[in-house]
Amino acid sequence: MKLLKIARFYHTKNLPIQMRCKRLDFFEGSEKKLEVYVKDVDLRALGKEYWSGIVERCQAKILSSISNDYCDAYLLSESSLFVWKDSFTMITCGTTMLVNSVEAFLERFDRENISLLVYERKNEYRPQLQKTSFFDDVKRFEKFVDGKAYRFGNVDEHHLFLYEMNNPYEPEPTDNTFEVLMYDLQGEAKKIWSCPKATLEEIQTKTAVRNIIPGFQVDDFKFDPCGYSLNAINGPHYFTIHVTPEESGSYVSFETNFQPEKNDYSKILAGVLKVFQPRSFDTVLFAPRINYKILADGFTLRTAVQSSLASGFDVKYCHFSWPVESVQSAKLL
């Protein structure tokens, strides 16, 4: 993990959101994520109209929603939003500007209402198509809050940028988040997820995607011609999946706050990998204390970075890939 000095990147183009999975176009699956905890505010009481406005600020829309006694889960045109009474998690992909939504939220509430703010941004396949860089986003955050910026992983490999607000925070012992970010789908998974003719019902039947963690209420959507998103909730817990089956850069994300027995995430990871069959993947784990390993049969650990944040969380980022067993052919462009 490396603490970053804030710099500025300049882009030559600002392009509109790309059409999903169009052959002559490109859609960026790599995501941006915001997690905010508040005090003295009931976020669910703000209502769908408020959250719809927050979502629209980053150039996305709410497609559908499900709710229970603990959480409202909104499926978005670009990923997902989960709202609890005292926190929310928002994930967006494509060329969305999640920083716009952050600003809209922070403009309404006082700094004293914010207990925790953590922003993640995965390095993109085509960063030149983005309207801002991570460093641009941080400069805008710091108009409202003080914080630190980090990079988990080497700059010339898969890596994760992270920004956290400077504020002491004591997370609950069970406040864990586990992410799996997958690349280059293979085999039958590639055929199923990249098939334009596949219906939502066929995807549900041919894969176990809705039952990676059993017992959850599920809301899912199949994009045209391809692409898939899923939200699932059970009590205060959620898991979410987003599939961008680009020929030139397929990407799938899985995330959950469900805590397995003895913090054994290997079983959940095995189920995720069975459904999507990636050539390589990252894991990102947030927990009050991380003193255990996550194992993946058949994959080689290439990168492991762990650090403790001011917010009271340990963060561990790992990158896994297939072992190199043969020479590949060059890709004809």
PLM ranges: what are they?
Residues 186-238, 245-251, 255-265, 273:
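Conserved mixed alpha/beta catalytic, RNA-binding, or beta-rich assembly cores of soluble enzyme
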Residues 125-148, 293-320, 324, 331:
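Short, low-order "capping/linker" segments at domain edges
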Residues 84-135:
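Hydrophobic, ordered structural segments
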Residues 43-49, 97-102, 189-190, 262-267:
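Short, conserved charged micro-motifs
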Residues 38-40, 92-94, 180-184, 256:
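Short, structured patches in soluble enzyme cores that scaffold and shape functional sites
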Residues 2-85, 124-132, 136, 140, ...:
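Short Lys/Arg-enriched alpha/beta "domain-start" segment
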Residues 17, 122-186, 194-195, 209-215, ...:
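Aromatic/basic-lined ligand-recognition segments
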Residues 112-122, 262, 266-303:
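Flexible helix-coil linker/hinge segments at domain or subdomain boundaries
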